Amino acid sequence: EFRGILQQLYDNGYVLVSLRDLTKNTATDDQPMFEQGDIYLPDGKKPLVLSQEDANFDTYRIDGPDDDLLADAEGDGFACQLLVNENGELTSKYIEADGTVKYGAYDFVTILEEFVRAHPDFSYHGAKATLALTGNEGVFGFQTHPAWQTELGVEAYMEQVRQAQQVAATLKANGWSFAAQGYSKLSFADSDTDTLQSNMLKWDEQVASIVGNTDILIFPLSSDIGGVDYYSGAKFSMLYDLGYRYFCNTDTASHWVQLRSNYLRQARRIVDGAALANEPGVFSDLFTATAVLDPSRP
């Protein structure tokens, strides 16, 4: 489905741009002064910001009901890890039901990498997408949660961290950016400021230490810290003080952007199986959903 979507986006004239391309900072001190960014595309081309949430390879993606942390016959066929191969390229680890291990383009990142290699003009200045990460189940399929240090031992645990850092560095070099999605997925609308702050500080400790700091926040659970009015209040002040300047909520509109001097908020359209099957018209300006929906979906 994703390969079909990418091909249609390309054929329809879309070009990947970074979320940060939407702004330029004209400040002369530490405080931002955002203005609309300048994006220069060939005639007929249209900018597209792409992102993926839950780019963690959480346990449910790689395990069946037996909790052995291995793919099996009752699993759902997800890739289980993002790696850097011996050639310095990103690759996905995929385990067949019979235990056979494969490496290749089996997930969002590696499929997009493959597509841009074949169609370099699909990317503006090398931009790929933004990956939103949580931290409570590790990063990129590695056991980077501190609780694993006791079970694995210090040396093996640090090797997991080192490999995850290598993946992060390779992603950055290849035009990817990272967004926080909270240490664990909480509703930013329903949780109080202190709870959210504690959650975000855990993200800094356990995820930023691997992927680096970020100024992008992709809200989990289709939540937000405010309505369509300009941001204000304790939650915004807390997140701003933690360094966040780009905020992404969800919406079904073709585009929705709120640019202020000190932040940018952009709505995201969620592309998943339910939306492709039940709301195909939401994507009509991007691609024809019925043409890419896999009939093998339950």
Where are these regions (language model features)?
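C-terminal active-site subregion of NodB/CE4 polysaccharide deacetylases
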Residues: 1-22, 34-50, 61-62, 173, ...
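Short, glycine/charge-rich beta-strand/loop segments that flank catalytic centers
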Residues: 21-29
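Metal-dependent polysaccharide deacetylase catalytic core of the NodB/CE4 family, i.e.
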Residues: 28-35, 41-48, 56-225, 253
